[in-house]
Amino acid sequence: EGFNIELAKQKERARASRVSNQSMNNQNEEYLNFKLKSTFIGYETLDASSQVIAIFKDGKQAESAKGVIQLVLDTTPFYAEMGGQIGDQGKLTIDGMNFDVINTMKLPNGQHLHIVDMKQTNIQVGDRVLVSVNYEFRKAICQNHSATHLLNEALRKVLGGHVLQQGSQVTNENLRFDFNHYENLTTKQILEIEKMVRDVIVQDYPVCIS
């Protein structure tokens, strides 16, 4: 009974997360109608000199703004939140002053939306900025992302090919992997799955993007 209660709670959390992101994108006409092109370069570099092509404040476009705002850049190395994986964090520099990029999300038409705390400094459309992804933060997310693939494979080998991913959450601190199975895992199965994943990790195989 306790297992079923926790399973129901997890399903509700996953549903709420999907609804939250979908509602932000699908219910805001400003986001839906924004069509300017933005290029992601985050697989080649973690730093860029970029131009601000749009500013959103409280869900509405603005020519200039300060405080916690959302920026779209013509080019960006920041990976956006998607598929249960959190977005990049980092720094934005303008006129020698540094500001925190606290999250990155994706707009309905594919552009990456940077949530930046500009404090009391005003920023305008057309401004040139330097942006830099937090390498350690990105690295930790990548490691947990890779771990979800290892876990998926181990689950299928131990439990059977019927196991399918039903959802996941990947952060810089941990991961959650949701899967279908017809009964609770035994202690023996859990230990076997953990060993399979750890055995691959200690091999320290190179990970390549193709």
Say what each PLM segment does.
Residues E1-S210:
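A glycine- and charged-residue-rich anion-binding loop/surface
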